Amino acid sequence: MNLVTAHDYAWIRTSPLFRHAMESGYTLTLIRARTPREVLRVMGAEPRGTGEGTAVLIEADDAHRAEVDYDYWDESYVAGAFSTPGENGAWTLVLGFDGGLGIAGACVETLSKGGRVVAHSTNGGKPIHLFHWFEDGELRTTFEGPSSRDGNTPDELVPLLREVGLPLTPEGEHDESAPDVDVKAAVLALAERLTGIRVTESLLQDATYELGLVPEQPAEEWTGVVIDITDAQGERLHRGWAYEEIATASDRARAEANAPVVITFNEPSAMDRSEYETGD
């Protein structure tokens, strides 16, 4: 029985590699019953050979960033994948210093069919820490904060979340009385509980990676925007706009901005002109 907890991942806070991952943004994905080449193919990655250790992966990604002139908006990146044993057979571990973008949702659904995918990420800078668990093509549980879960079975992992040290009540609510815990370390422990893979610095540094250049993903179509804000006094603002409303307003604003400026001048009356000319 796997009893790993957040304590077993305390090493991440003294690891130069993990510090780099947190600062640059990363995604670590574990995929059951898929080979590294198969995973990179589904991701649409262009093969970039193999490399020993994370240093080669970082160098390859840095070289790609230079190729695109360090374009901030370019979301392509070099990912590394290798095979490692875990629960119920071989798994593929994919690591990318991708700013926390993660593998595209459609790809993960495909990769998890007939198996399991577990992923965690950080976007660096102003950190957003995400966790995802897919099973047989279905997003079962996802969260940023463990007390605000989503997915088709958002509460299924609550017992495991509590066991690895996350501060939750048996009902899955935040437990104010629970001791402080390193949430990121707890998430890595949770991933091990679901995969049987102990991620260590040496595992990542010593692996032989299949490298692939992951292209930018096309933007998803959207149908509207919702603003849902609750202020410190508990006042809530909830309002939504359909795509058509936003498009109409945008077209109107654009037309007004491009319209010619007309300056009108009112001709003074004869009496006003007389007073102006005489100075009366």
Regions found by a protein language model. Give the residues of each.
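Long, compositionally biased intrinsically disordered terminal regions
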Residues: L3-T14, W133-D280
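Hydrophobic alpha-helical segments that drive targeting, anchoring, or assembly
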Residues: T5-V164
